[in-house]
């Protein structure tokens, strides 16, 4: 994933 979407991906992982 890109740095601009890392926050979104982290949120999806920490459901």
Curated annotation (Swiss-Prot):
The keyword Ribonucleoprotein applies. Its main location: plastid. Keywords: Chloroplast, Plastid, Ribonucleoprotein, Ribosomal protein. Transmembrane segments: none annotated. One of its GO terms (cellular component) is chloroplast. Induction: Expression shows a diurnal pattern of oscillation across the 24-hour light-dark, with increased levels during the dark period (at protein level). It is found in: Plastid; Plastid, Chloroplast. It comes from the Eukaryota. Forms part of the ribosomal stalk which helps the ribosome interact with GTP-bound translation factors. Is thus essential for accurate translation. Homodimer. Part of the ribosomal stalk of the 50S ribosomal subunit. Forms a multimeric L10(L12)X complex, where L10 forms an elongated spine to which 2 to 4 L12 dimers bind in a sequential fashion. Binds GTP-bound translation factors. Belongs to the bacterial ribosomal protein bL12 family. This is Large ribosomal subunit protein bL12c.
